[in-house]
């Protein structure tokens, strides 16, 4: 779908469908009043009959109104006079998109300037959410269906904006398009079956991306290099699999050579059986999503490349498959990490932190401004925060605050959990420097505490996206593309874009 921005009178546009808002009590805004005048009061006459109450998301389609060049007028309820919240605004836009998809029109014009969204400016903030909602709603994953989804008639949507705000709306659409593209790539990777999407496949995807962008350098570390670097924890996770582990390094140079990079670290467990600590069979198919941390880093990089942000960014994808076999790691094994610290592996299903801890040590060589790791790390995070909010921890209050703010601005929220020193004691082991689990209490926090021991050399934050990376079951089952909006917003803020 193509999104364009224009500053013209709604009453004069030639389109298959013109979309106008109607408030509760059938109140028309300034733009809709002008259109109503052009069609000699046909809209207000329909509203007087009570066919549309104006509640948020309600729609009414009118055909062939005289005096207009639009073939149809779609009225959408915008609620009471007070501003809509983010969720209500997204639902309204999705409602409009649902109607437009059912029509045979190739284009539509949205004249929604009269709707206010709380805590969003009238141009960039409001239209960024609108554009992301429209574009993300276009996503379809039917690669393995013998019958593909039918092509949609709607190819182009024009957003009408006043002249004063047109440039900001265009900037919003530009950013939203890049974010939606990154989310779609993330969702594609997450939704792929694990027999195809394994560590080597992700490495090939990285190389293809590197070929397409001169500013991006790609290096793939194989299992021998991982072992030679002393990454005993990372190497241990992949021991039971026929698919060898890979550490994928993507280095984007968009800023000055002397600028310190931001580093994103993604957990890329392409399938997680739990290893010898085998998971229950029910729902195990969804463990293909255990690489969504790496996928979201990949998607964020795609957005950064599309926007050509003037920053330096290093993406580290820690990829392995966690399988049981005669060569797999056992509960009770002790490994030495790249940092020199030793870990007693008490549960092989707590493997994400093992690939991440060595990758966090590896990140030191880039002398980063900040390091953010993203992982589907703990089921405890789903218990704590559900599927709406990502967990967030870190060792630097400014960094954590910046990420929380980015989440609010991108409508991709996170919530901070503590890393109090008392929680560290739960990781004590009688045989090694630490265990890889901290008991049944505060599982998300103790996982963060574990990682914090490998991130002391720089400002660091950890995002647990176990509840937000995918939707379980039902017709909407699949990867969500989160937290690409939050991460991209954070980098947009750092770039001053």
Swiss-Prot record:
Cofactor(s) recorded in Swiss-Prot or TrEMBL: Mn(2+)
Organism superkingdom: Bacteria
Keyword hit for Protease: yes
Keyword terms: Aminopeptidase, Cytoplasm, Hydrolase, Manganese, Metal-binding, Protease
GO molecular function, one term: metalloaminopeptidase activity
GO CC field: cytoplasm
Cofactor note text: Binds 2 manganese ions per subunit.
Coiled-coil zones: none
Active site (UniProt): 279, 353
GO biological process: proteolysis
The reaction(s) this protein catalyses: Release of an N-terminal amino acid, Xaa-|-Yaa-, in which Xaa is preferably Leu, but may be other amino acids including Pro although not Arg or Lys, and Yaa may be Pro. Amino acid amides and methyl esters are also readily hydrolyzed, but rates on arylamides are exceedingly low; Release of an N-terminal amino acid, preferentially leucine, but not glutamic or aspartic acids
Assigned EC number: 3.4.11.1, 3.4.11.10
Localisation per UniProt entry: Cytoplasm
Chief location bin: cytoplasm
Enzyme class: hydrolase
Binding site residues for Mn(2+) 2: 267, 272, 290, 351
Annotated positions binding Mn(2+) 1: 272, 349, 351
Biological role stated in the UniProt entry: Presumably involved in the processing and regular turnover of intracellular proteins. Catalyzes the removal of unsubstituted N-terminal amino acids from various peptides.
Stated family: Belongs to the peptidase M17 family.
Name this protein carries in UniProt: Probable cytosol aminopeptidase
Species: Pseudomonas putida (strain ATCC 47054 / DSM 6125 / CFBP 8728 / NCIMB 11950 / KT2440)
Gene name of this polypeptide: pepA
């Amino acid at each position: 779908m193509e999104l364009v921005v224009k500053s013209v009178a709604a009453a004069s546009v030639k389109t298959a469908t013109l979309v106008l808002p109607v408030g509760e009590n059938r109140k028309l805004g300034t733009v809709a009043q002008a259109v109503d005048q052009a069609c000699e009061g046909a809209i207000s006459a329909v509203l007087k009959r009570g066919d549309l109450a104006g509640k948020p998301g309600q729609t009414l389609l009118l055909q062939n109104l005289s005096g207009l060049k639009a073939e149809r007028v779609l009225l959408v309820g915008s609620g009471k006079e007070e501003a809509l919240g983010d969720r209500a605004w997204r639902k309204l836009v999705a409602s409009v998109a649902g109607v437009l998809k059912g029509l045979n029109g190739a284009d539509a014009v949205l004249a929604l300037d009269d709707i206010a969204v709380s805590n969003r400016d009238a141009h960039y903030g409001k239209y960024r959410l609108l554009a992301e909602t429209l574009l993300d709603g276009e996503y379809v994953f039917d690669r393995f269906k013998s019958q593909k989804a039918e092509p949609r008639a709607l190819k182009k949507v024009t957003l009408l904006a006043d002249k004063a705000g047109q440039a900001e709306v265009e900037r919003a659409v530009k950013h939203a398009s890049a974010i939606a593209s990154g989310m779609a790539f993330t969702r594609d990777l997450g939704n792929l079956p694990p027999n195809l999407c394994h560590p080597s496949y992700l490495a090939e995807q990285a190389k293809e991306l590197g070929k397409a962008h001169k500013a991006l350098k790609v290096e793939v570390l194989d299992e021998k290099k991982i072992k030679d670097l002393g990454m005993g924890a990372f190497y241990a996770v992949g021991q039971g699999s026929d698919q060898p582990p890979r550490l994928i390094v993507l280095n984007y140079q968009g800023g000055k050579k002397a600028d310190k990079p931001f580093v994103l670290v993604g957990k890329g467990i392409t399938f997680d059986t739990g290893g010898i600590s085998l998971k229950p069979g029910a729902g195990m198919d969804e463990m293909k999503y255990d690489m969504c941390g790496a996928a979201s880093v990949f998607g964020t990089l795609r957005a950064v490349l599309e926007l050509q942000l003037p920053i330096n960014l290093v993406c580290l994808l820690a990829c392995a498959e966690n399988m049981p076999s005669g060569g797999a790691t056992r509960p009770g094994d002790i490994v030495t990490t790249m940092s020199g610290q030793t870990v007693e592996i008490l549960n092989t299903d707590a493997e994400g932190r093992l690939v991440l801890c060595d990758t966090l040590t590896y990140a030191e060589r880039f002398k980063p401004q900040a390091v953010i790791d993203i992982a589907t790390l703990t089921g405890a995070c789903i218990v704590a925060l559900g599927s709406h909010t990502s967990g967030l921890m870190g060792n630097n209050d400014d960094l954590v605050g910046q990420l929380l703010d980015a989440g609010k601005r991108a409508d991709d929220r996170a919530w901070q959990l503590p890393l109090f020193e008392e929680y560290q004691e739960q990781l004590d082991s009688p045989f090694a420097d630490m265990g890889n689990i901290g008991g049944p209490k505060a599982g998300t926090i103790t996982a963060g505490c574990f990682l914090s021991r490998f991130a002391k050399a720089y400002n660091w934050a950890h995002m647990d996206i176990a509840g937000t990376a995918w939707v379980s079951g039902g017709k909407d089952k699949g990867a969500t593309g989160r937290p690409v909006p939050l991460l991209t917003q954070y980098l947009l803020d750092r770039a001053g874009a």
